[in-house]
């Protein structure tokens, strides 16, 4: 390998010609497009799954959510950061014990 035989760098505005070996490789590759039509998939949910997909409010305490929204809007919501940190640390410790 000789330093004298390297190709000079060209500015970004100029386009370098492709190597003929690159063009030959591209013509040999099979096309990614398929000529066969793609069929759709039909999904049938069971009654239990369909019920779970429906919005419900049984697991949400709507009154508590509204109280929290009002406290946030008025700037009166206070958070016990120590309690949050303790719960987070307990959660991490439990995860480390189980693994």
UniProtKB/Swiss-Prot annotation:
Signal peptide: none
Keyword Chloroplast: no
SUPFAM superfamilies with a match to the protein in the record: Anti-sigma factor FlgM
Protein name: Negative regulator of flagellin synthesis
Assigned protein family: Belongs to the FlgM family.
Start and end residues of each stretch annotated as Disordered: 1-42
Function of the protein: Responsible for the coupling of flagellin expression to flagellar assembly by preventing expression of the flagellin genes when a component of the middle class of proteins is defective. It negatively regulates flagellar genes by inhibiting the activity of FliA by directly binding to FliA.
Matching NCBIfam families: FlgM_jcvi (TIGR03824)
Keywords recorded for this protein, A-Z: Bacterial flagellum biogenesis, Repressor, Transcription, Transcription regulation
GO biological process: bacterial-type flagellum organization; negative regulation of DNA-templated transcription
A Pfam family per the record: FlgM
Biased composition annotated in UniProt, kind: Polar residues: 13-39
Residue intervals passing through the bilayer: none
């Amino acid at each position: 390998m000789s330093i004298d035989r390297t190709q000079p760098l060209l500015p970004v505005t100029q386009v370098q010609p492709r190597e003929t070996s690159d063009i030959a490789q591209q013509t040999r590759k099979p096309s990614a497009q398929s000529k066969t039509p793609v069929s759709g998939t039909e999904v049938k949910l069971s009654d239990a799954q369909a019920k779970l997909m429906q919005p419900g409010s049984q697991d949400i305490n709507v009154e508590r959510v509204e109280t929290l929204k009002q406290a946030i809007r008025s700037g009166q919501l206070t958070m016990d950061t120590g309690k949050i940190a303790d719960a987070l640390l307990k959660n991490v410790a439990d995860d480390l014990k189980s693994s």
